[in-house]
Regions:
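N-terminal phosphate/diphosphate-binding loop that engages ATP/GTP or pyrophosphate donors
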Residues: 3-9, 23-94, 98, 103-107
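Switch II (G3) loop of P-loop NTPases
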Residues: 99-131
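Hydrophobic anchor at the start of a short beta-strand
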Residues: 38-39, 114, 147-149, 177-178
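Conserved glycine(s) of the Walker
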Residues: 19-20
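Inter-motif core of Ras-like GTPase G domains
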Residues: 127-155
Length: 234
């Protein structure tokens, strides 16, 4: 697939936390914007930041040069834990997955593509009931908007298993994995990483559409160049 063909609602999820979802979201948003599409980015659940700090979605928007009005965070929980756990420890009532799905449809109206960045992996609890990204996919589909799904994964030893488990979990719920992205690729990959690059599509059962260079997460120019390369090479 060509990443610039994405439209509608696109869920960017991952095999784990800290796999590069935010930078990958920024790269995809930039590629779509450079192709002429109107893009919005949503992070429904953010944890572990003070209210005056920029969140992941704000970082993604800045890196991709997305207008601030099109960069949305719905709820923020204080401790750097799964949203369900962080909200429970803080005594917070946070929006349910059903409420979030409805709001995403409202906020996506009028945009060519809406990127929704998850938190952690696909089974991590997001709302007070412990519903996760898979439940969000279900909720959007019930509302007539089957989302595209991008899975961000690691390069290192063990990623084939984690990637396969994640993609199988998504398919077992009746959803398609459109593509996978390696969220952080080192300058000097080791033997395991080089082998993983060759084998990860088979493990995932989905195409690898991008390998994001490590350490570009603070450089908008590098993100936008990576996005250009992504659009040109597929």
């Amino acid at each position: 697939m060509n990443i610039t063909d994405l439209n509608g609602i696109v869920i960017v999820t991952g095999t784990d936390t800290d796999v590069g979802k935010t930078v990958t979201t920024a790269v995809i948003a930039s590629a779509l914007k450079q192709s002429g599409k109107d893009v919005t980015i949503i992070k429904p659940y953010q944890t572990g930041l003070d209210h005056d700090e920029p969140g992941d979605v704000h970082d993604a928007g800045r890196l991709a040069s997305i207008d601030a009005d099109n960069v949305l965070e719905y709820v923020r929980c204080p401790e750097p834990l799964a949203p369900t756990t962080s909200a429970a420890r803080a005594g917070m009532t946070i929006p349910s997955i059903e409420e979030v799905a409805t709001r995403i449809l409202v906020d996506s109206d009028g945009h060519d593509a809406t990127l929704v960045e998850g938190a952690g992996g696909v089974l991590v609890g997001l709302d007070n009931d412990g519903s996760g990204v898979l439940d969000l996919m279900d909720a959007l589909t019930r509302r007539g908007h089957e989302p595209h799904v991008i899975v961000v994964t690691r390069s290192v030893l063990g990623t084939l298993n984690h990637t396969g488990l994640t993609c199988n979990a998504i398919r077992d719920r009746g959803h398609q994995v459109d593509a996978i992205v390696i969220g952080s690729w080192p300058d000097r990959p080791d033997l395991a990483e080089r082998c993983n690059l060759e084998e990860i599509e088979d493990a995932a059962g989905a195409p690898l559409v991008g390998v994001i260079p490590a350490c570009i997460g603070k450089d908008p120019e590098a993100v936008q160049q990576t996005a250009r390369n992504l659009g040109e090479t597929q």
